Amino acid sequence: MNNYTNYVIAHKDFEWNTPQWYNDTFTQISTHKVKSNLKNSIVIDTDYDDKLYGEITYVDWILKNCKTPLVSINHYRRILNAPVIGQPVFSKPINLLVTMYDHFSACHSKKLIDDFIASLADDNLKKLVTEGMQQKVIIPYNLFSGPLQVLAQWYNFVAQPIIEFMKGIKNVEKYVKESGALDYNSARNNSIEYQKRIAAFLSERMSTIFWTRVCQGVPGEVSLLEDNQHI
């Protein structure tokens, strides 16, 4: 039995010129039927609305269904070039000219990030996120390769607070109008499309805080800090 499972999260049809080993060993997962050149595909059943939670939906499903100790997750447009073989790997950090907080405020919505931080019930977590948002670095995209246990810890830190926050959003328009976000995100030309991305915008920043503040080391050599008991 293999000790790893490789997944590709697919929102749309894709038929890339991927090598045969990739087509044979990666399993496509989606919330609706999509076409691909992968050998195996699964349409997942979920309690979450994919329009609101994006990749968090898939991670939740993987944690409930994956039977191997190691896992890799790829986006259908961003793929790892080999199966998972060892320690956690994630996207390369990108240095920012401004803090992650100011970057989010300018590109998306200051009110959105302020409201999210205010919604955090745990004071230690709120302090950690507030300080983490002052970093001038971001780890983008949605690639992961490593132990399923680390993915579960990521989920507890990143996904759970976002899910609770999303449940409380009554009107996304206040975030869209406040920042002119639809003008910046020209491809997402209405508030419904923007709403689909809110969880993704937040999870990208929370993921950065998880890897840089909750974990230590560098990509490929990640170990959890023992003093973060709230995870």
Regions found by a protein language model. Give the residues of each.
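ER/Golgi luminal nucleotide-sugar-dependent glycosyltransferases, focusing on the catalytic module
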Residues: 1-231
